[in-house]
Amino acid sequence: MFSNAAAFSTVALATYAAATPAVVARTEPHPSSSNCGTTTIECCKDVGTATSLESPLKSAFIQHGLVSSLLVALGVVKVVDVVLGVVVDPNVVLGLTCSTVAVGGSCNAQQVCCENVAFNGLVNVGCTAIDIL
């Protein structure tokens, strides 16, 4: 019985790991707002790597009831993996507390283009800062 449970756990974990997409940080130059492609322009309160935003990320996840403080103790990169279902490199750029910038709208924080948006802009993954002309 125990060997069946162990085998199932191993296969399930391997399947999860193989099916989880990886997010990679962009290395090309910062785009202008016209080069965001199909992504929208977001105005984010905090922008930085998962490692540099560890404290605000932990607070946001706990405040919004997405995870318990026990899970946050595992580390912010693991939390993003569990909550978003996306494997995040510690150096990928994230945007926190973001909202879409309307055409002609203004932003009092950092404007970015992001590849993945989760929880109505609470966490955006794969962001690139926009040079405003």
UniProtKB/Swiss-Prot annotation:
Compartments annotated for it: namely: Secreted; Secreted, Cell wall
Query: Where would one find the signal peptide in this protein?
Result: 1-25
Q: Which Pfam families does its entry note?
A: Hydrophobin
Q: Which UniProt keywords apply?
A: Cell wall, Disulfide bond, Secreted, Signal
- What highest taxon heads this organism's lineage? Eukaryota
Which molecular function terms from Gene Ontology are attached?
structural constituent of cell wall
The answer on whether this UniProt entry bears the keyword Phosphoprotein reads: no
Q: Which SMART domains match?
A: HYDRO
Q: Which CDD domains match?
A: hydrophobin_I
| InterPro entries documented for this protein | Hydrophobin (IPR001338)
- The cysteines joined by S-S bonds are C36-C113, C43-C107, C44-C98, C114-C127
Please give an example of a GO cellular component term from this record: extracellular region
Q: Does the keyword Secreted apply?
A: yes
Q: State how it assembles.
A: Self-assembles to form functional amyloid fibrils called rodlets. Self-assembly into fibrillar rodlets occurs spontaneously at hydrophobic:hydrophilic interfaces and the rodlets further associate laterally to form amphipathic monolayers.
The family assignment reads:
Belongs to the fungal hydrophobin family.
| Protein's job | Aerial growth, conidiation, and dispersal of filamentous fungi in the environment rely upon a capability of their secreting small amphipathic proteins called hydrophobins (HPBs) with low sequence identity. Class I can self-assemble into an outermost layer of rodlet bundles on aerial cell surfaces, conferring cellular hydrophobicity that supports fungal growth, development and dispersal; whereas Class II form highly ordered films at water-air interfaces through intermolecular interactions but contribute nothing to the rodlet structure.
Protein name as annotated? Unclassified hydrophobin 14
- The UniProt gene name for this protein comes to Hydph14
